[in-house]
Every structure is written in structure tokens, then in C-alpha cells.
Amino acid sequence: METRKDDMEKRNDKSEPLLLPENGSDVSEEASWMVYLSTIIAVCGSYEFGTCVGYSAPTQFGIMEELNLSYSQFSVFGSILNMGAVLGAITSGKISDFIGRKGAMRLSSVISAIGWLIIYLAKGDVPLDFGRFLTGYGCGTLSFVVPVFIAEISPRKLRGALATLNQLFIVIGLASMFLIGAVVNWRTLALTGVAPCVVLFFGTWFIPESPRWLEMVGRHSDFEIALQKLRGPQANITREAGEIQEYLASLAHLPKATLMDLIDKKNIRFVIVGVGLMFFQQFVGINGVIFYAQQIFVSAGASPTLGSILYSIEQVVLTALGATLLIDRLGRRPLLMASAVGMLIGCLLIGNSFLLKAHGLALDIIPALAVSGVLVYIGSFSIGMGAIPWVIMSEIFPINLKGTAGGLVTVVNWLSSWLVSFTFNFLMIWSPHGTFYVYGGVCVLAIIFIAKLVPETKGRTLEEIQAMMM
């Protein structure tokens, strides 16, 4: 270790940029079973995220009837999740930097489990809302720390596929709430939300901490032990460990980043890419389409049940396809571009269906047009814009910025999510077809943004990505 430290000091004495190998042939590319176990444990947090978001839809009428809630009271219950998530997102970066990635996941699982138990025991709207707020806080923290943890433990050749499992398990969590909610009451459904929290809390005791975080806080021996576990006992980790240590050493003299540091010219590109992707992920209208899909089908004269079943199956299948086969073969940028173009087509199909209905034209094809538009839109979102912004967010930020910048982009995501959900009904009242033409316009802006600013990160180490963007 002393020799390695001396080497790093010699390198740092030279005023040379950090140059990393282009082909990375000497970097450990092996992944032991521990990488897969660690990822599966971590995405229990993603599944928990999905259950939180999906809980309100199948429970609305049961909760309102049993607790005698008005529509406005239930609307508060539904939306307060976002308020808790924003607070969780604001604090997530600092918490994960202070107590570690595993510590942040454990804390979030405990808070979420308490929230679910309060919902289960609720006798009125106040405890119901408080429990929902706590689950939202857990969601906000998990939405940041899970993709970051996966990115930091994964070999670069698997990082995209493993990181995309975050979105896949969010979708599975959403779908499970709809399926289980169809056969159990709302209190029992709340108890099912505790299960992933329990698995996540206890599972983190059996997996290593992020090696990069361990090195960042000066736990050098733990860093090497964790990296060796993740790469396998026979793997040669010398080069990979050296790159990580050299890169972190180059950042060691820098103070902890503040929000003002994010607008510094050497950091602004990281922030623009991260914030921009989160902005476009939401403002293409995804929450409006998902939350009100049944309303869209009914308004267009299509079967809401059939449409909901089709888009739920499609979302899981295509997210899995993107996670396992495409992201590390085709790359991030091509999938993002294809996703945005597909969503534009979906928006035009849905918008045209409402325009035809408003003018009483081609009434016999309107249901097929609306359903196909939603399916094209959801499918396109699932292969790219759903998962990849979180993957890129976890890859691009230097570790000294990751807490502050990652927290910022997660807050932007949750605030954008709330704003889209809140404004969707007002836009639909203004003009159903105009709503989707507006979202289509945002898709066009997203295509331009991706083409001009988003880097390709496939096949690069985290240190290479961050050096490339400096």
C-alpha cells in the first residue's frame, strides 16, 4: 500500500491531466457472484420504490369508503408521497456520503417500513398521510442511492445492464401493487410493502460496501477487501484499484461540493446533462400517461381494462429487454434517441385520436389509434427514457460532486414528476389533443438535447467517463 501511495503522490506532483487507458485491457472485468447478489439486494429498494408509487391506484375506493375520506383528502394522500420523496432526495446525497451507500439503504428501508405499518394501522387521514409521507421519504432516498451503489460496484461491461435493473424492479413493484391489490384489501396491501424493506435491511449485512465510497472515506484496507469480493478471489484487481485510488487522490484536495460549486464552469456540463435528462424523463408526460391511462382509453372509447393489461405487460417485458440485452450492446445514446423518437410518435397517435374524436371523424379507428399510441409511447419509454437517465446520473458525477449533484437531479426528477401529474388534468380540460402535441414538442427538444449534449458512457470505467467530461 505504501508503494502505491508513493506512486500516486509522484503522479499528483506532476501537473498532468488524468489520462486513463483507452482500451482498459488491464482493468479487471470479472464479476463474481457477489456482484449479482449485491445488485439483487439493492434493487429490493427499487421494488419498494415501485410499490410506493403504485399503492394509491388500487386502494383508492377501499380507503375512501372505510375511512370516509373525500376526494380532496385522498388527493392529499396520493400527492404527499412526492413531498416526502423531495425531502428524501434533498438529503439522500449527504446521507449516503456520511453513512455509506449501504447505510443509506438500511435507513431508507427502516423509514419506509415504519410508514407502511402506520398506513396499515391508520384510523383516519392524519396517520394515513404521515405514513405515506414516510414511505415517500424512503423512495426519494432510494431513487438516488440504489443506482449509485450499483454503478459503483459493477464492472464496466456489466454496469449498464445491472444499473438498468433499477428501473425494471420499479416497474415490477408497480405491477405487483395492481395485481395483489386486485385480491386483497388496502391494509393487507400495505403490509406487502414491508417485505422488500425487510429483505433490503437484512440483505445489506451480507454484501460489501461500495469500494469507491470506502476509499473516499479513507478505509483503504476495506476498499481492497470489498473490491476483491466483488471481482472474485482469483481476479487481479491491481489495475482497477490503482485507477480508482489515483482518481480519488486527484480529487482529495478539493473541498466538499456545495450547490454553488455545481455552476462552476468545470462542473456545469455534468449538471446540465443530469438535470436535463431528469427534466425530459418527466416532462415528456410519462406520469400523465401512466396515472391516467385508463382515463385516456375511456375518453377515446377504448377498453380501459384491456389497455391497462397490455401496457403493464409491455412495460415489464421491454424494460427487461433494455436491461439485459440492449444497453451494453447498443449504448446509452442510441437507446435514448430511439426512445424519444418513439414517444414522439406515440404522442402524435394519441393526440390525433383525440383530434379526430373532437371533430367526429373516423370514429371507428379512434380506439385502436389511442391504444396503439399509448402502447408505442409506453414501450418507447421503457427501452430508454425510463431507465437510462438514472444509469447516466450514476455514472457521470465525480465522487466529490456525487452527493450534492445527485441529490439535486433527484429533486428535479421528483418535482418534475409532481408537476406533470398535477397539471395533466388541467391540460386535458384545456385540450386533450393539444396536451399530447405539447408532450410531443417536449420529445423533439429531448431529441435535440440528447444529440448535442449527452455523452456515450458504454464500455468506460466511471473514472474514464468523468475524465472525458472534464
Curated annotation (Swiss-Prot):
Entry keyword Ribonucleoprotein: no
Disulfide bonds listed in the record: none
Membrane topology designation: Multi-pass membrane protein
Membrane-spanning intervals of the chain: 33-53, 73-93, 110-130, 133-153, 164-184, 188-208, 270-290, 307-327, 335-355, 373-393, 409-429, 434-454
An example Gene Ontology CC term for this record: nucleus
Gene3D superfamilies the record matches: MFS general substrate transporter like domains (1.20.1250.20)
Any one Pfam family match given in the protein's UniProt record, by short name: Sugar_tr
PANTHER family: PTHR48021, SUGAR TRANSPORTER ERD6-LIKE 8
Name of the protein described by the UniProt record: Sugar transporter ERD6-like 8
Highest classification ranks of the organism: Eukaryota, Viridiplantae, Streptophyta, Embryophyta, Tracheophyta
